[in-house]
Amino acid sequence: QHGQTATLTLTVVDGKQGASIPESSMSQTDAARQEIVRLVNQVRRENGVPELTVNAALMDAAQHCASLRVAYHQNKVECEAVAASGYPHGFGSNITAFANVPASETAGRAVENWRNSPGHFQTMINPDCDTIGVGISTDEGGTICFLFVGDPNAHNPYA
């Protein structure tokens, strides 16, 4: 196996002015996570790339990282979280953070932010990746969304 190194860009944007951040229940968060999976797979289909399969370990790792409320890439934290979740390979990751966006629009905003950022877009449509995990955390400071896409041919140095 070989390792891969990538540089990704974090996109932080403000949402609608004056909108409040609704209290997000676990079911709303789970629904938004699944909607991100659906939207990422839609982007992949539009670009001629096979859909990703949900991976429980990557879902757990992404949710853990989102729950840490880290709004920028920390490779060691991400690699350790993915390894601890049980995913044995390398991965790509996207993060986006925003405020003042209703819970019902979280998934759409996250994927749109990634679509509009060249590095994030390339992570979403990487043909080497075959699995996906998503995490979302919302508090009074805003929402953070994590995306992990698993690459079975890449190496995680912490795994």
Indicate residue ranges for each PLM-predicted region.
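Short, surface-exposed glycine/acidic/tryptophan-bearing loops
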Residues: 60-105
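Ser/Thr/Gly/Pro-rich low-complexity, disordered linker/stalk segments of secreted
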Residues: 16-26, 158-159
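Extracytoplasmic/secreted envelope proteins and their assembly/folding machinery
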Residues: 33-41, 59, 63-66, 92, ...
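Surface-exposed patches in mature extracellular/periplasmic domains of secreted proteins
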Residues: 46-60, 73-85, 120-137
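A short alpha-helix/helix-coil micro-patch that ends at or immediately precedes a cysteine
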Residues: 21-71
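C-terminal edge beta-strand
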Residues: 4-15
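Disulfide-stabilized extracellular recognition modules
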Residues: 101-159
